Amino acid sequence: MSPTSETAQGGRRLVIVESPAKAKTIKGYLGPGYVVEASVGHIRDLPNGAAEVPEKYTGEVRRLGVDVEHDFEPIYVVNADKKAQVKKLKDLLKESDELYLATDEDREGEAIAWHLQEVLKPKVPVKRMVFHEITKAAIQAAVANPRQLNQKLVDAQETRRILDRLYGYEVSPVLWKKVMPRLSAGRVQSVATRLVVERERERIAFRSAEYWDLTGTFATGRAGDPSDPSSLVARLQTVDGRRVAQGRDFDSLGQLKGANTLHLDEANARALAAALENTRFSVRSVESKPYRRSPYAPFRTTTLQQEASRKLGFGAKATMQIAQKLYENGYITYMRTDSTTLSDTAISAARAQVTQLYGADYLPPQPRTYAAKVKNAQEAHEAIRPSGDRFRTPAETGLTGDQFKLYELIWKRTVASQMKDATGNSVTVKIGGTAADGRDVEFSASGKTITFHGFLKAYVEGADDPNAELDDRERRLPQVAEGDPLTADEITVDGHSTKPPARYTEASLVKELEEREIGRPSTYASIIGTILDRGYVFKKGTALVPSFLSFAVVNLLEKHFGRLVDYDFTAKMEDDLDRIARGEAQAVPWLKRFYFGEGTVEGVAADAGNGDGDHLGGLKELVTDLGAIDAREVSSFPVGNDIVLRVGRYGPYIERGDKDTDGHQRADIPEDLAPDELTVELAEELLAKPSGDFELGVDPATGHTIVAKDGRYGPYVTEILPEGTPKTGKNAVKPRTASLFKSMALDTVTLEDALKLMSLPRVVGTDADGQEITAQNGRYGPYLKKGTDSRSLQSEEQLFTITLEEAQAIYAQPKQRGRAAAKPPLKELGEDPVSGKPVVVKDGRFGPYVTDGETNATLRSGDSVETITPERGFELLAEKRAKAPAKKTAKKAATKKTTAAKTTAAKKTAAKKTTAAKKTAAKKTAAKTTAVKKTAVKKATASKAASED
C-alpha cells in the first residue's frame, strides 16, 4: 500500500527530519497527507553557560549543567535560536494524527529524536522512521516499517555528552588559570593534539644521517621496444656480500642500526664508482613471482575522508559538508558509517554496472563481501555508496564542481569493489660484477607487468586518473636470463639524507585516531576543525603543525592529568561507552567512577588521574588541587645556550637570564614558527635584536629619536621621549605612536615613513555642515571620521591622498554597515560545492577572506591570495559554516605579533646526484628560511572553550 493511500485512511502525519534540504527532498516522495518539517539539527542541549540554566539550579549544577550529586542528571534547555522552530513544530503537531521522527539512524540522530519527543510531548502515536538513503523506494519503505526509539542508544549518547561536558568544563578552566585564558580541553581533541605534538617532538629530537649509494643503467645490447626495453636501471644492493645502507637502516639519532650493513660516505661511493668504470657485468639471477591485488572495500567515513584528502585535496570537514549535500539530495547513502557492508541491492547494482561498462570478464563469479575493520562497527548501516537500485554514473547525475568530484570518487570505489583482482608478474633481476680493486658488487632491479588490470581499470587509490596511472604501475624490465652479459652505460653516485618523521596531515591523523580506536570516526572532522580553530594546530600546506601553545597545553595535561590524554585509557573509555550502548554496562556507576573515583566497577576504565598507587582518584579530585601545577614550569622549554622558550599569556617568546638581571634578554617569536625550526642559531639571532627596535633617526621638529618596534599588537613606530619627561599624573606626556601599514616592514621602514604615520590622524577638511572630516588608521584599517559617523577607506595610502571632495562623495553614499563600497574580488575560485554560489577572495578590514556571499572565512597563516586553491577556499568556508550559528564571544585577549626578517633555521644537507665521470661540485647545503608571520591564537567564549570533544 502506498503512503498516499495509507494516509487517506490514517489522517495527517507529521514527519520531522534534521535539515530543510532533506525535508524538501523527502516531501516529494510522500503523499499530500504528509507534512515534512525540519528540526534544523539539535533543538535541546546542555546549557552553554550559567545564564541559560533555570534559576532553581545553583552551585555546581548551574556551572556544569549536570547534577553530579544526583546520578549525573543533565539539565537540558531549548536552544535560544530554536525556540521559534519548536513552536512551529508544536503547532504542526496539534494538527497531526501521527508523528514520525525521521532523524539520522545513529547515536546522535537517536538522541535528537528523543529530545523532540520530550519537548513536543505528543499526544498522538509516535514512530521512529529510519533510512540510509533518500530515494523514493527507501523513504516509502521507511514509512511502512517504522520502529520504536532505541533507548539504549539514547542513554549511550547522553552518557557520552555528560562525560564530554564534565571533561571540558572541569579541565578547561585549569588551562585558563595555568596557561592562557579561553583555551579548551576535550576528551578527544586533547588526545589528538597530543599526537600532533608528539610527532613534532620526534622531529625536534631527530638527527639526520647522510648516506650514499650507486645507481647503474645497464644495456642489453639489443634494440628495444615498449614491450621489451633495451636497458634497465638498478640500484647497488651489496658490496662483498654486505648490504648497502639505505634510509631505513638509520635510527632517529642518525646512527646505523645493523653492524653488518655497509655505510657508504661520499668519498667511498665515488671511489667505488671509479673502480666500476671498466667492469664487465652479467645477470646473476632472474626471479619471477605472480602478482595479485584485490580491490579496496567500499568507503566508510574515515576512508572517504582520507581518499578525498589524497586525491581531491579536500579537508575532512569539507569532505563531510559535500557528502552531506550529496546525501540530502539523494545521490549517496548516509555518510557517517563505520561499515563496509553493501546491501544485496547495492551489490546487484554494482555488478550490473561492471558488466555494462567493463564487460563480463571483469566480474567475479561471486559477489565480494568485506569484513568490518572498525571495532563496534554499526553493521545496520551500509558503506557509503551511490543511492538507489541502479547507480547513476557521474555523467548522469548533472552534478558539478566538488560535488561531482566526490560523487565520482564514491561511485568508482563502489563499482571497483565488485570487480576482479588485478593480476600479473613481479620480476627481480640481480646484476653482478667485480670492481677494479677486487670488490664484488651486486645491483638489483625490480619490475612488474600487469596481465589483467581488473579493478584497476576503474579505481586506483591515491591517483586521479586510473588510465594514466595504469602505465605507471607497470615497470617493465628487458627479457634477460641468468648469465646474460650487460654493459654499464652509466654509474651515478647519489647522496641522500634521512628525513624526520612526516607531520600528520588531516588524512593521516584521521587514520591514526581510528587505528588507536580513539573517539568515533563520525566526529574526526569536527575534532580536527576544533584543534585548528583553537590555535593548537595550524597548517603548512597539508601538514598539521602544532603551535608552541599546544606544547604548553599538552605538557600540563601529561604531567598532571596523565590518564586523560593516555591513548589506551581514551580508547578504553570509548569501548566502555559502546558497552553502555549495548546494555552491557550501566551509565551512572561508570560516570561515578570517572568523576569521583569511587568504588570499583567491573569492566570500567581506570581512574581519571595518573594511576599511581592503589588510590583511584577521579576527575573532581584532580581539578580541585591545582597548587602542585607550576604555571611557569609547564610553559617553559629549554632551547640551548641557556635560552628558554616560554609560552606567555600573549604568545610565545624566548629569554635568557633572570628578568631582573642586567644580562636578561628577551625576544618574541612568531606563533606560526614550526617548533622544530626553533634552533639555537635562530634563537640567538632573535635575541641579537633586543625588543626588535630599529632606530630610524631624529625628528627635526622635536629632536626626539624615532624607532620602529615589534610589539604585542604588531609592528609600530614611536618616539623616545627625553629622560625626565613625566610618564604619570596630570602632566604625563605620551609618546606619539603609529602602526605600520600592511605594505611596510620593520627592516625597510624609513624615518620619512614614520613621521608621516605619526602625523595621523590627518584633517581632510570641513564639511558643509561645519563638521571636520579626518582620515585615521584604526584597528580594522583606514577610515574617515566625521563626528560619530565613520566610513572605511579602500587602502591605507588614501589616508594621505584623499581630498575633501572625495571624502564628501563617500559620505554622500548610503552607509553600508560602516563599510565602504564593495571592492572587486582579488581572485575567483569557482562554484562552492555546498551553497552552489560563486566563491571569491576579497580584501577586508581583517585581511583577505573567501566568501560565497553568505559565509565569510578569513585566510589563515600559510594561505595567500596568490596560492590559495579552490579546494582550500571551499574548505575554509565549510569549516566556518560548521561553527554556525555564531555565538557572542568575549573580547579576545591580545596576542603578540612579530614581523621580523626571514631567518635561517638549521641547515640541512641537500641530496646530490652526480655521475662518476664528472668532476664533483662542492657540497652545498640547503638552508631553511622561515617566513615570520602572525597567527592569532583563536579563542572562544568560556562556554565554547569547555567544549566536548
Where are these regions (language model features)?
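C-terminal or mid-to-C-terminal helical accessory/interaction module adjacent to the motor/catalytic core
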Residues: 94-95, 134-218, 288-292
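Flexible beta-alpha connector loops of hexameric P-loop NTPases
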Residues: 75-79, 311, 498, 516-517
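Intrinsically disordered, low-complexity regulatory segments
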Residues: 1-161, 170, 175, 250, ...
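Basic, low-complexity terminal or inter-domain segments flanking catalytic cores
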Residues: 2-5, 10-14, 24-25, 32, ...
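Conserved short loop/turn motifs at secondary-structure junctions
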Residues: 11, 104-105, 180-184, 288-297, ...
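C-terminal accessory/connector segments of nucleic-acid motor ATPases
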Residues: 206-236, 273, 280-316, 322, ...
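C-terminal helical "lid" subdomain and adjoining coupling/linker elements of P-loop NTPases
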Residues: 178-182, 197-264, 311
